Amino acid sequence: VRAHGAKVLVSFGDAVKNLDNLKGTFAKLSELHCDKLHEDPENFKLLGNILVICLAEHFGKEFTPEVQAATQKTVAGVANALAHKYH
């Protein structure tokens, strides 16, 4: 589980580097999660929400409303990109 968590966090780093092409960045992962793992795409949204909560807890006052909004927008974009193969 820890190794998968590390991969997930690295993928969010990739998202930040590729905000203008999230669907392309996550195309292979979308295919993997849809075709092979049969993951419920709602879980991508849930994971994003959990990540926002964890970051808010970790950064405290530094996690301003502006940072929260940007983070939520990014995790929503990642969730949408991961769910792309399902559409």
Swiss-Prot record:
GO cellular component, one term: haptoglobin-hemoglobin complex
Keyword NAD recorded: no
GO molecular-function terms, A-Z: haptoglobin binding; heme binding; metal ion binding; organic acid binding; oxygen binding; oxygen carrier activity; peroxidase activity
Modified residues (S-nitrosocysteine): 34
Entry-linked InterPro entries: Globin, Globin-like_sf, Globin/Proto, Hemoglobin_b, Hemoglobin_oxygen_transport
Residue positions where N6-acetyllysine is found in the record: 23, 85
Presence of the UniProt keyword Acetylation in the record: yes
Binding-site residues for heme b, renumbered to this chain: 4, 33
Cited Pfam families: Globin
Keywords of the record: Acetylation, Heme, Iron, Metal-binding, Oxygen transport, S-nitrosylation, Transport
Summary of the function given for this chain in its UniProt record: Involved in oxygen transport from the lung to the various peripheral tissues.
Family: Belongs to the globin family.
Name of the protein described by the UniProt record: Hemoglobin subunit beta
Lineage of the species this protein comes from: Eukaryota, Metazoa, Chordata, Craniata, Vertebrata
